[in-house]
Amino acid sequence: MKAMIFAAGLGSRLKPLTDTRPKALITVGGKTMLEHIILKLKAAGFDEIVINVHHFSNQILAFLEANQNFGIDIQISDETDCLLDTGGGLERAYYLLHHPEDMFTKEGETPYELIFENLMKGMDEEEIIERGLGIMRKECYLLHNVDILSNCDFESLMYYHQNSSNINATLLVSPRKTSRYLLFNDDNLLRGWVNKDTMETKPAGLRYKEGEYREYAYSGIQVTTPKILNLLPRGKYSIIDFYLSI
């Protein structure tokens, strides 16, 4: 399984701690936040991790080297030239996360070839299409902000996403109090965002009305898919803003 840790941010809300180090290396309970997340991912069965870096990137690279990458395959997405936020950062990491060969069956077929071949044999149409789509759904990635520590069961989150039909991204949210909420409809589909301090809303033109949506705080953890990666434009933007634009 594959994951990406967003560790490039400036950590402005953690100043003055981040004046001399990246937020990924802030220590909590005797371990850096980055170490907590890497070890939790490793324990959950993840064997490939991409980490994006920008602020004090040399410190993160040295930390990983000193710890032999904690015995896991870790690749670095370098944003030292320009901080890209979560959406742009994910797009830059595209080729580190997405390997087309992972979309093949054990027999070397793509999901599309499998669907076509078995339909030609006269097999049940719904069953074959579901098998092909199942292969595509299994190729997904867990995305995790580096400044989030949680008791989330990563295996259960991945299982939920992989066994949910027609879902391109699964966001981990909570009912905690905040000024900024994600807005969902009754089917738990993302429909908007609101800052209750300023009453700014997204997407443009959204009219917010109290009680019209289910309101949750984003927890900084999600699962996404190759389909989303293929749609991402280059540039600097939030992944949540991107979801609200499509």
Identify the residue ranges that each predicted region occupies:
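Conserved N-terminal catalytic core of the sugar/cofactor nucleotidyltransferase
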Residues: K2-I5, R13, T27, K31-N145, ...
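Conserved beta-strand segments of alpha/beta enzyme cores
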Residues: A24, D73-Q75, N168, L189
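Catalytic-core segments of class I nucleotidyltransferases/pyrophosphorylases
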Residues: E101-T110, F116-M120, E125-G134, E139-L142, ...
